[in-house]
């Protein structure tokens, strides 16, 4: 295929868009791949659509290779299935809802678990029909509060979502493993630098869960890794390395002190270091108790207290993941006024336990550890309160912030922080959705068997931006050959009629060899053409310029930056095709 730039619907820009924040956003707009039409909404122009379709092709090839069958659901979905799973409520303001002219409720699909489950239930009824994997590549919609970074976080986006259906956990594990390997092949073919991290399932439900994160400084996801062992996890899924318990016998009794106006950790530590306690005190020696209200879906608000070492803050992403699907709100002054036993700035475990407030502790607060914490009276704290002797909790919770240098959960070394962009997520859903819809089939013994599911997503349109983030330089984009809009960008940089005719002939020969060619036949200066070639980012650039008269053309490697001369002759097209395929 030959596409002439004189006929291509394309306009490049020399300046960055004023509202573009990240390199991919700037370059994709400047190079004419996408255009904004509203907050979080983008049109795909010819070059951008070719990249998107090439990524879809790679995904389809690998999904088909593991036995996936492609289907397509509507994007406009009725309310009823999402009411059955309670996700009509759980999604809150994050989805687009609408009514038809008869007052019936719909949403623009953010995800399709319900539809996949109902479809399989309606079509199959025997164990002989399984295992089964279905997938779709479909536009999704989410009402992002703050769309940002171009197509990295948009309101309308393309996803591949697949679902495996099996009659037992062994089949689910096999499907999960097959998808995991397929995803690795997909991202390797796309030349994405990524890491696989342990993750949490969130509103999707399920048990085992892993994310594929593309390494990027502009990523919104924080993850950690241990260099020594290879352990990696999304920050929400990090399990705190729990210290060993300490002996309780022989520890001094807890003592209540008048500490004055010390409602913050900083003021409490300052008091402690002036009080003659016989040791230097840091924030890590204090225990702060954070109060909130939580509500399970369909339930009532109830109090929850979380105790964390005073040198740690609550990480709201980790907190939300730990409490999911419950929602939470930190107590405000009006709330504290309703519970006089909660003395703001001086809350301790005693009042919490006496008033039946659910109390969860950070895993570092193990039996035998001694703490300075609130004494439930204004201006008073207790020193030497020992966990397991003076107070207990209802359990532990992973809600405190994770830090660079924290010990890895596997004990192999320290954690290193990094940032990434989520490009894929795989879940072992189990029976959450098949339970909701009673998706049973007849087993080998003639008795009903409840199907078990896996869910596997890839952000297809997001991958365009991710690859642009990872593969660009100060001149422009640099697309991997697998998904580039064209294999060769052929630039006519010579006004001579013979050179122009030779370039057009060369394009035809390359086309005959199966090479897709973008032919710059515009009446523009060589400088303009070269700048556009660098900006557009085809992996190979062939220049028919002044050297044509001497029997040579230039072949430029956009990835490696090398340039070499090739001799004009009968084998020129073959030589170029061999070079770009090698």
Curated annotation (Swiss-Prot):
GO terms for cellular component: cytosol. InterPro entries: aa-tRNA-synt_IIb, aa-tRNA-synth_II, aa-tRNA-synth_II/BPL/LPL, Anticodon-bd, Anticodon-bd_dom_sf, Pro-tRNA-ligase_IIa, Pro-tRNA-synth_IIa_bac-type, Pro-tRNA-Synthase_IIa_type1. The keyword Aminoacyl-tRNA synthetase applies. It comes from the Bacteria. GO terms for molecular function: aminoacyl-tRNA deacylase activity; ATP binding; proline-tRNA ligase activity. Pfam families: HGTP_anticodon, tRNA-synt_2b, tRNA_edit. CDD domains: ProRS_anticodon_short, ProRS_core_prok. Gene3D superfamilies: Anticodon-binding domain (3.40.50.800), Bira Bifunctional Protein, Domain 2 (3.30.930.10), YbaK/aminoacyl-tRNA synthetase-associated domain (3.90.960.10). It is an enzyme of class 6 (ligase). Consists of three domains: the N-terminal catalytic domain, the editing domain and the C-terminal anticodon-binding domain. Catalyzes the attachment of proline to tRNA(Pro) in a two-step reaction: proline is first activated by ATP to form Pro-AMP and then transferred to the acceptor end of tRNA(Pro). As ProRS can inadvertently accommodate and process non-cognate amino acids such as alanine and cysteine, to avoid such errors it has two additional distinct editing activities against alanine. One activity is designated as 'pretransfer' editing and involves the tRNA(Pro)-independent hydrolysis of activated Ala-AMP. PANTHER family: MITOCHONDRIAL RIBOSOME PROTEIN L39/PROLYL-TRNA LIGASE FAMILY MEMBER, PROLINE--TRNA LIGASE. Belongs to the class-II aminoacyl-tRNA synthetase family. ProS type 1 subfamily. This is Proline--tRNA ligase. It comes from Mycobacterium ulcerans (strain Agy99).
């Amino acid at each position: 295929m030959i596409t002439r730039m004189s006929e291509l619907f394309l306009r490049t820009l020399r300046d960055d868009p004023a509202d573009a924040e990240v390199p991919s956003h700037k370059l994709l707009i400047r190079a004419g791949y996408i255009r904004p039409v509203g907050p979080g909404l983008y049109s795909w122009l010819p070059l951008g659509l070719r990249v998107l379709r090439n990524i879809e092709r790679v995904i389809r090839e690998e999904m088909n290779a593991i036995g996936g069958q492609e289907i397509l659901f509507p994007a406009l979905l009725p309310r009823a299935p999402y009411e059955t799973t309670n996700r009509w409520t759980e999604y809150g303001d994050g989805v687009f809802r609408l009514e038809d002219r008869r007052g019936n409720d719909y949403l623009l699909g953010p995800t399709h678990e319900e539809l996949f489950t109902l479809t399989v239930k309606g079509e199959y009824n025997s164990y002989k029909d399984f295992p089964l994997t279905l997938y779709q590549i479909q536009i999704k919609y989410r009402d992002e509060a703050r769309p940002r970074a171009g197509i990295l976080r948009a309101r309308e986006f393309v996803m591949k979502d697949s679902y495996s259906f099996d009659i037992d956990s062994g089949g689910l594990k096999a499907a999960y493993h097959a998808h995991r390997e397929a995803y690795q092949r997909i991202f390797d073919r796309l030349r994405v630098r990524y890491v696989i991290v342990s993750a949490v399932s969130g509103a999707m439900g399920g048990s085992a869960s892993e994310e594929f994160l593309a390494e990027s400084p502009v990523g919104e996801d924080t993850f950690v890794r241990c260099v020594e062992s290879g352990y990696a996890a999304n920050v929400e899924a990090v399990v705190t390395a729990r210290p060993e318990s300490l002996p309780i016998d022989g520890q001094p009794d807890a003592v209540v002190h008048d500490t004055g106006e010390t409602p913050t950790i900083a003021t409490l530590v300052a008091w402690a270091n002036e009080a003659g306690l016989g040791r230097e005190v840091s924030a890590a020696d204090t225990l702060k108790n954070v109060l909130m209200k939580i509500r399970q879906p369909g339930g009532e608000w109830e109090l929850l207290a979380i105790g964390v070492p005073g040198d740690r803050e609550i990480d709201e992403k980790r907190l939300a993941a730990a409490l999911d699907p419950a929602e939470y709100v930190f107590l405000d002054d009006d709330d504290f006024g309703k519970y006089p036993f909660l003395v703001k700035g001086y809350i301790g475990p005693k009042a919490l336990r006496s008033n039946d407030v659910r109390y969860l502790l950070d895993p570092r607060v193990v039996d035998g550890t001694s703490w300075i914490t609130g004494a439930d009276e204004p201006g008073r704290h207790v020193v030497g309160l020992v966990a397991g002797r003076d107070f207990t909790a209802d359990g532990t919770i992973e809600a405190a912030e994770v830090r660079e240098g924290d010990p890895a959960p596997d004990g192999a070394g320290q954690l290193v922080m990094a940032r990434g962009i989520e490009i894929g997520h795989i879940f072992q859903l189990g029976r959450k959705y098949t339970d909701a819809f009673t998706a049973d089939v007849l087993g080998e013994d003639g008795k009903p068997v409840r199907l078990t599911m896996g869910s596997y997503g890839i952000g297809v349109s997001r991958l365009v931006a991710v690859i642009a983030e990872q593969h660009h330089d100060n001149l422009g984009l640099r697309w991997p050959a697998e998904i580039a809009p064209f294999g060769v960008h052929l630039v006519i940089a010579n006004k001579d009629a013979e050179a122009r005719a030779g370039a057009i002939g060369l394009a035809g020969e390359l086309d005959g060899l199966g090479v897709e060619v973008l032919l710059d036949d515009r009446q523009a200066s060589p400088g303009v053409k070269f700048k556009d070639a660098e900006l557009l980012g085809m992996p190979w650039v062939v220049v028919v310029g002044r050297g044509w008269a001497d029997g040579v053309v230039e072949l430029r490697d956009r990835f490696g930056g090398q340039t070499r001369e090739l001799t004009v002759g009968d084998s020129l097209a073959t030589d170029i095709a061999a070079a770009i395929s090698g």
